[in-house]
Amino acid sequence: MVTSIDGKVTGEFLSRPECEAATEIYYEMNREYKAQGSGGFICGRVTMEGSFTGGWYPDLSEYKTVEKCLGHYMNCWFDDVADANYFAIAFDPKGKLGWKSNIIEDSDPGYGGAMIIEVLTEQVDPRYLAYLEEKEISYFFAGETEIDVPLALKILRDHLAPEFYVLEGGSIINGHFLRADCVDEISLVQAPVTADKDSKSLFMDGDIFDFELTETEKKNGALVMRYTRPKEE
């Protein structure tokens, strides 16, 4: 995550020129994680909307209701996607993201070509499922009203067997993962700027966990830090 000096991860500070170098380092790290075997990146609804869908949403009145089968709808179209071993996993509890394709279209190789998977709750409109199926977008359910993070990760692990995933925010989903004790490593790129009062912290509603600082590097005016959870005795 790119952070301000005071530990914020989203806000107006990210658009300042002081953040340009830190942001580019962040993208470089994402590409490195992909090369090291990452199964893809995980983001919450707001981050996916801001980065990829732009707020577009389908007219669900055009779709028939699909019965909510609480099993999995993991599609079989992987052979048609060149980068099908890499996924964009959207934690979208109520199904509010509007995708125009089943892959991420982005010029950055750390994102472009990733096959989209929607992680939903039972609160989703059944017509949204019909829309996803029309777009050949994989989805599965992982909770009634809130996404059960350990359950979602188990389903992904059982179906895709990744080395690891990269969690890329925002603040709300970061907090969910931390509280569920599902954060093994934290990589931060601290930009030389502070944030305003409306900016969001790294972990919203987080909890106390111990980490070990394993790496620090000053790079292009930013500070790169890596933390890992202590190994259990």
Which residue ranges define each predicted feature?
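Enzymes that bind and transform nitrogen-containing heteroaromatic metabolites
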Residues: 1-233
